Amino acid sequence: MWSEYSLEVVDAVARNGSFSAAAQELHRVPSAVSYTVRQLEEWLAVPLFERRHRDVELTAAGAWFLKEGRSVVKKMQITRQQCQQIANGWRGQLAIAVDNIVRPERTRQMIVDFYRHFDDVELLVFQEVFNGVWDALSDGRVELAIGATRAIPVGGRYAFRDMGMLSWSCVVASHHPLALMDGPFSDDTLRNWPSLVREDTSRTLPKRITWLLDNQKRVVVPDWESSATCISAGLCIGMVPTHFAKPWLNEGKWVALELENPFPDSACCLTWQQNDMSPALTWLLEYLGDSETLNKEWLREPEETPATGD
């Protein structure tokens, strides 16, 4: 049976061209080197070296063995390292859920920063809507969720970090009929136009809808890009996160409506599986920061940088 040491011996003999030179490099006696090679040849049932009067040279089988053996040893070393990492809590993947209500640019930056720190761990990020976040967590598909509602629909052992409140804005395109009318608007007035809806991604838990009045038509969209297109086209009323609406409101393309029944802010949280920590998850929890940082970076509209004079 061959070992990492026997491969090292064969490699030394092949490079030096003799058993004695290889023995000198390995700090062994020539007979020990010769014995190791002979035992390996008997196990393989093929000669590894062509023995000449003054030197030795690898046979075709010997050259193949050396090439393949190096590859096997490299894999063995990687396997050994991974076993040690796993014993210390390392896992090759970290799966997280991100609620669609958070600022998308923050998710993108988090991914970049994660891979700068972990080049041997895959970060799997799943975009979920409403109860889809809790569904992914309760099913064990993810280990952490960002932007989950604090109205917890499932039982289980979860740790939490408050993210504060998310504010909503009811918006329409600046050319929409409601934009030309004075508020505050009643539900009876609003239900004459369709409501923008993001479909809940939950597989097993009850599905939720952000804002939909009785007998109101829906415009169902798959993502925020489609949401912006539909709102800008004047197809619907949109109840959207204020941080999402801000650029269009600032440019005058959308108008925020005043409602007789204002939509309340949503309480959000960061939550993760308790007693299932890994180095990557520990790092991510520290990276995400405290409650104030989470609210500022993930739920609020970006702060405008004041202009500076020369």
Curated annotation (Swiss-Prot):
UniProt xrefs under PROSITE patterns: HTH_LYSR
GO biological process, one term: regulation of DNA-templated transcription
One Pfam family per UniProt: LysR_substrate
Disruption phenotype: The deletion of the gene leads to a substantially decreased growth rate in minimal medium with adenosine, inosine or guanosine as the nitrogen source.
Gene Ontology MF term list: DNA-binding transcription factor activity; transcription cis-regulatory region binding
Residues annotated to bind DNA: 19-38
Chief place of localization: cytoplasm
Localisation: Cytoplasm
Domain HTH lysR-type: 2-59
Keywords: Activator, Cytoplasm, DNA-binding, Transcription, Transcription regulation
InterPro entries to which the protein is assigned, alphabetical: LysR_subst-bd, Tscrpt_reg_HTH_LysR, WH-like_DNA-bd_sf, WH_DNA-bd_sf
Family: Belongs to the LysR transcriptional regulatory family.
Protein's job: Transcriptional regulator that activates the expression of punC, which encodes a purine nucleoside transporter. In the presence of adenine, it binds to a conserved 23-bp palindromic motif in the intergenic region between punR and punC.
Alphabetical list of NCBIfam families matching this protein: PRK11074.1
Protein's recorded name: HTH-type transcriptional regulator PunR
Lineage: Bacteria, Pseudomonadati, Pseudomonadota, Gammaproteobacteria, Enterobacterales
